[in-house]
Amino acid sequence: MAGRSNPRHARWRRQGGPSAATVIGLLVCVVCFSAAFFLWKAALSGSGRNESGEEPFRPVVGDPPYRVCIDAGHGGSDPGARGVVEEKEMTAQTSEALLALLEADPNYIPLRSRESYDATAKPSERAGAINAQIPQLLLSIHGNSAPEGSAAAGFECYPSVPGRTWHRESYYFAQQLAQGMQAAGAKLRGHGGIRYIYYQGEVKQLVESTHTEVRDERSFTLLEDVNCPAVLAEQCFVTSEEDVAQFGSEEGCKTVARVYYEAICAYFGTQPLDTPL
């Protein structure tokens, strides 16, 4: 009859799904949980802690003036890579502009790895010259290259590898360099622009910085043999017209020098000067 309900149908309606009150309760729980999570993240960010509750790493640097060595990676009879520009010319221009910025800043004592850009010096010889000056930080400036027809471009840098005395400090400095270059418009290669290099005899193996295992193979000579935190930077591809226009031309080298200078300031915790080049 139309006026009577079927008990079986009523039971089905009661058991067919959660009530509105239950759904609302679940939604409230989800919202509360999400709010608590974001408040926790904000608290960590405000306190400077990471998700494990630990303070983020900061190098212990002491008081200024800080001794910073700049290494032009090629020079003399060693031209480095050739392309749109010659690597040794680009590294010399960048090094000179960076040294000028450091010389103008009383927080720093700039040091050089070679007597002149026309001097030929092996990495082992430069490492010895660097150590003799007792630096607190080393930046080795290089340019990258690729075979003809390759579209390879971008910035990458190589800190002292895991397990070495100055690895954590070097990695921290590498982060400042990569972040600065990205902000300047460079494409970052690899994981965040940071990679490791190992040599197995004459064979070079590139490893992403996510691989943190300690290995016995040596990395770049300068990174292995200097007694301070060190990073080797490949500021752009000398074989890429676009890269060179942005970061390897005369003005591009000045741009990169400024990025490197500000990364050094970030490492030591000083305020960069507005020094024009």
Predicted regions and their residues:
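Glycine- and acidic-residue-enriched helix-capping/strand-helix junction motifs
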Residues: 80-93
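Acidic/histidine-enriched, beta-strand-rich ligand/metal-binding domains
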Residues: 31-32, 39
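The N-terminal extracellular segments of secreted preproproteins, especially immediately downstream
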Residues: 28-31, 68
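Short linear motifs in intrinsically disordered/low-complexity regions
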Residues: 7-10, 51, 64-65
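Catalytic-core environment of secreted peptidases
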Residues: 57-83, 139
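N-terminal Lys/Arg-rich, disordered targeting/topogenic segments
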Residues: 1-21
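Intrinsic disorder/low-complexity detector
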Residues: 8-11, 76, 80, 146, ...
